[in-house]
């Protein structure tokens, strides 16, 4: 058994190591600077109490993006030096973010241990490669992202760090082969266990969903299916679940080989970046591929996000979570005993609110960031939650879960088609959504993203909008000047959240303008980009009249869009005449 000593390496703080909503994300060239990664990892160890580190087991894996291999080896060596007893690594360093959460919560190691936390190496939906993004975040023993108290402490430590601990001479571990490698150090034996990345997660999915019912659906000749992993880590799980377990043809999988640069693409499952899937589903500009599949879905780099499509039909994430919640008890065995409650992020449309009211469920509106849902789940008051940024999930783990959302939709389709196994007239994705609108009304919804805007201009825009809120008569003069048919603004504020579980308060979570007819305009600066600022504008309008729920959303929302752009002086502050992405 190889032995190692602990080295103390002198270092100096780097500016800007403040974790955002999902960890620290920077360009690879920033992370590759001497001591940069080590400073952040040591600051994380120092922010955690000894009982969470000494003699404990940690998970270290990620989405396979460029720089992951080096980072995993560094974190293994630093874990050994900081008194960790065992490190678990997914084979090839791969684990989806929801799978990491499942592994922390469910897996038992060869030595009988359970994990007390994880370093997840991902920048989620951001591009990968030598000139692109890398990221790291820490998840706690509940499987969820570190709470603000911990991330604030990590940041504080990064500003004062003087040294880090590392087992320099520990040889690199072969992470392509499953098995345990053991070393001897000052605190005794240190193990690195490389394990099958899919096993724990697949077992969990099989305990939640009726795989036989989904298999029957996929065997209907007229039910065609397409899944695009955008060369992210989801591909590993897609092959195992959709092909091996559920019997789908391998030809129904697109871009399911993980690549460190995501094939040169942008692994963000939306109508702009998932071009190949969008074309195949009949939603592209050209429609030369014949009849589209009945169901399509896509994932982001670390497989926590999802996009759901029907044939020539896009399901908004806000509608998706509402439809899953409305059908969960009937269609998904895990929820057969009823839902504890539901929650959405503030910018997400109020479609879920209407379902909660209709079904008499507890309902919560939280800031953007999955950790807020985790608190509600740990308290046993939330079963299903979602956010407009293509994140949907439930209390089976403490992260959003892209493949879970796809299986939820397949379960609903299987349930609606259970008496229709010859597939003569399938109940389609579009049918399910339109039936939902007929029952609950429709929330027309769109999001405008202005990416990599000058940070100064973005901050000025937000400050201007806050100041404007103090004079609603001025606001309504601007509104009516743009479009007389738009309802009056009756309230405007900056969203603030008091956590009902731990009492913590989160301020400055987005600027809201609320209209008399239930419409909303929301402005936020995003915390997930690696440079510049991203301004997000959310526009929502509720339509109860079922005869008016079939309009094109961009057409229905045009008056409100015009109001939002004028009200915010978007072009003046951002320097952009149009958004980077419209969803």
Swiss-Prot record:
Top enzyme class: isomerase
Biological process annotations from GO: glucose metabolic process
Coiled coil (residue ranges): none
Residues at the catalytic site: 124 (phosphoserine intermediate)
Major localisation: cytoplasm
This enzyme's EC code(s): 5.4.2.2
Subcellular localization(s) per the UniProt record: Cytoplasm
Taxonomy, superkingdom: Eukaryota
Residues bearing the modification Phosphoserine: 124
Co-factor(s): Mg(2+)
CDD domains: PGM1
GO function term, MF aspect, one: magnesium ion binding
InterPro entries: A-D-PHexomutase_a/b/a-I, A-D-PHexomutase_a/b/a-I/II/III, A-D-PHexomutase_a/b/a-II, A-D-PHexomutase_a/b/a-III, A-D-PHexomutase_C_sf, A-D-PHexomutase_CS, Alpha-D-phosphohexomutase_SF, PGM
Sorted UniProt keywords: Carbohydrate metabolism, Cytoplasm, Glucose metabolism, Isomerase, Magnesium, Metal-binding, Phosphoprotein
Record carries keyword NAD: no
Family annotation (NCBIfam families): PRK07564.1-1
Protein family membership: Belongs to the phosphohexose mutase family.
PANTHER family xref list: PHOSPHOGLUCOMUTASE, PHOSPHOHEXOMUTASE FAMILY MEMBER
Function: Catalyzes the reversible isomerization of alpha-D-glucose 1-phosphate to alpha-D-glucose 6-phosphate. The mechanism proceeds via the intermediate compound alpha-D-glucose 1,6-bisphosphate. This enzyme participates in both the breakdown and synthesis of glucose.
Subunit structure, interactors included: Monomer.
The protein, known as: Phosphoglucomutase, cytoplasmic
Organism name: Mesembryanthemum crystallinum (Common ice plant)
């Amino acid at each position: 058994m190889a032995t190692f000593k602990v080295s103390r390496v002198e270092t100096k703080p780097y500016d800007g190591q403040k974790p955002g909503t999902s960890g620290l994300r920077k360009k690879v060239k920033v992370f590759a600077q001497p001591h940069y990664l080590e400073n952040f990892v040591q600051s994380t160890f120092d922010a955690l109490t000894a009982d969470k580190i000494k003699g404990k087991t940690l998970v270290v894996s990620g989405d396979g993006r460029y720089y992951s291999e080096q980072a995993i080896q560094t974190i293994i060596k630093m874990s050994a030096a900081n008194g960790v007893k065992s490190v678990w690594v997914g084979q090839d360093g791969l684990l989806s973010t929801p799978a990491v959460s499942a592994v922390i919560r469910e897996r038992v190691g060869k030595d009988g241990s359970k994990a007390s936390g994880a370093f997840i190496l991902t920048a989620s939906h951001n591009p990968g490669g030598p000139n692109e993004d890398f990221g790291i975040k820490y998840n706690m023993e509940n499987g969820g992202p570190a709470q603000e108290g911990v991330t604030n402490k990590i940041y504080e430590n990064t500003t004062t760090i003087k040294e880090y601990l590392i087992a320099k001479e520990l040889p690199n571990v072969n992470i392509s082969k499953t098995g345990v490698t053991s070393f001897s150090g000052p605190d005794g034996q240190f193990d690195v266990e490389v394990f099958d990345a899919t096993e724990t997660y697949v077992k969990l999915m099989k305990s939640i969903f009726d795989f036989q019912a989904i298999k029957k659906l996929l065997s209907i000749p007229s039910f065609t299916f397409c899944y695009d992993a955008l060369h992210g880590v989801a591909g590993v799980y897609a092959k195992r679940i959709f092909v091996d377990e559920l019997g789908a043809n391998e030809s129904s999988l697109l871009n399911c080989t993980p690549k460190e640069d995501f094939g040169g693409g942008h692994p963000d499952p939306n109508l702009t970046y998932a071009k190949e899937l969008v074309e195949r589903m009949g939603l592209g500009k050209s429609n030369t591929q014949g009849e589209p599949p009945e169901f399509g879905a896509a994932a982001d780099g670390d497989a926590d996000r999802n996009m759901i499509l029907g044939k020539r039909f896009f399901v908004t994430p806000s509608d998706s979570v509402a439809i899953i919640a409305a059908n969960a008890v009937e269609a998904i065995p895990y929820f057969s005993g009823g839902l504890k409650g539901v929650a959405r992020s503030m910018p997400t449309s109020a479609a879920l609110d209407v379902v909660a009211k209709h079904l008499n469920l507890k309902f919560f509106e939280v800031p953007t960031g999955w950790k807020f849902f985790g608190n509600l789940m740990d308290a046993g008051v939330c079963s299903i939650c979602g956010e407009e940024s293509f994140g949907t999930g439930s209390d089976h783990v403490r992260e959003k879960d892209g493949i879970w959302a796809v299986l939820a939709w397949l379960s609903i389709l299987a349930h609606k088609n259970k008496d229709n196994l010859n597939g003569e007239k399938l109940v389609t994705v579009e049918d399910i959504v339109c039936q939902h609108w007929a029952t609950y009304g429709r929330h027309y919804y769109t999001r405008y993203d202005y990416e990599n805007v000058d940070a100064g201009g973005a901050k000025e825009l937000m400050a201007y909008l806050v100041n404007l809120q103090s004079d609603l008569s001025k606001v309504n003069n601007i509104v009516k000047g743009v479009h007389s048919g738009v309802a009056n603004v009756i309230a405007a504020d900056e969203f603030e959240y008091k956590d009902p579980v731990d009492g913590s308060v989160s301020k400055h979570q987005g600027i809201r303008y609320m209209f008399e007819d239930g419409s909303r305009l929301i402005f936020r600066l995003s915390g997930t980009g690696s440079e510049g600022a991203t301004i997000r504008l959310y526009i929502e309008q509720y339509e109860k009249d079922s005869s008016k729920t079939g309009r094109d959303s961009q057409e229905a929302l045009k008056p409100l869009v015009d109001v939002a752009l004028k009200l915010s002086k978007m072009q003046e502050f951002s320097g952009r005449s149009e958004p980077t992405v419209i969803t």
